[in-house]
A protein has these predicted regions:
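Active-site microenvironments in enzyme catalytic cores
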Residues: 2-126
């Protein structure tokens, strides 16, 4: 996993805006690596951090973290060797047994991801 950033701050902001727009208006976008094939995992996490910052500025509440690509088969399919970590906000979570409008989704489907809702903030190095 590369810890080197290859994207400029401007690229990170622009890609974040693209992801945010797609999420807000529920439309599909091409993979970010289609435009930036040299994009590193660190770049991806930088885009995610900018998205998290924007959501929190819009009064989303950070409630936990989720892990994706947790199976070996999915990691191989996606060309990575470690799971990915993402954030979970109150606006992403749904109460148990609640209805979800499919019009709010791009490609409606169920996908198992491990998520952690924490009672207190996690603290530590990195």
């Amino acid at each position: 996993m590369s810890t080197q950033l290859t994207l400029s701050r401007e690229d990170i902001v622009r890609l974040c805006e693209r992801v945010e727009g797609a999420e807000t208006r529920a439309y599909a976008i091409p993979k970010l690596t289609d435009e930036y094939p040299a994009m590193t995992v660190a770049d991806g996490y930088a885009v995610q951090a900018e998205l998290r910052r924007r959501f929190i500025a819009q009064a989303h509440k950070l409630i936990g973290w989720k892990a994706g690509l947790t199976s070996k088969a999915k990691m191989v399919q996606m060309g990575v060797n470690v799971p990915s970590i993402g954030f979970l906000t109150d606006r992403m979570a749904r109460p148990e047994n609640s209805a979800i409008k499919t019009s709010d989704l791009v490609h409606p489907r169920a996908e198992c991801e491990v998520a952690f809702v924490t009672k207190a903030d996690l603290k530590g190095p990195n």
